[in-house]
A protein has these predicted regions:
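Low-complexity, intrinsically disordered short peptide segments enriched in small/polar/basic residues
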Residues: 1-3, 15, 56-57, 73
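N-terminal acidic leader/helix
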Residues: 2-30
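Short, structured coil/loop segments at alpha-helix boundaries
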Residues: 4-7, 39-41, 69
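Hydrophobic transmembrane signal anchors and adjacent membrane-proximal interface regions, especially
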Residues: 12, 16, 34, 42-45, ...
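Acidic, low-complexity, intrinsically disordered interaction modules
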Residues: 21-65
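Charged low-complexity stretches with an acidic bias
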Residues: 54-83
Length: 83
């Protein structure tokens, strides 16, 4: 599995996570840091201490930077534009 395949797999896992109402009370940054950023201590620290909204914005920016914007599901689109 290539690095791109792994990124895509993690991205879709994250999409499933954020769109599942059972998980809305869990800090997205915590989940994201565990799955994406284990080796980047300073970024991981930021995620562990982020509020859900801050984490959402940071993650959405990361997705935009990595060209995933054409496939964002509706709930992420809503968060992206603050709806």
């Amino acid at each position: 599995m290539s690095a791109v395949d792994i990124e895509k797999q993690l991205y879709f896992q994250w999409c499933a996570f954020i769109t599942n109402p059972q998980h809305h009370d869990i800090r997205l940054g915590q989940w994201f840091s565990i799955h994406y950023l284990k080796a980047e201590d300073s970024v991981t620290h930021k995620f562990w201490n982020a509020t859900t909204l801050e984490a959402q914005r940071y993650i959405i920016q990361w997705l935009e930077d990595h060209c995933y914007t054409d496939t964002l599901p509706p709930k992420i689109e809503e968060a992206r534009y603050g709806n």
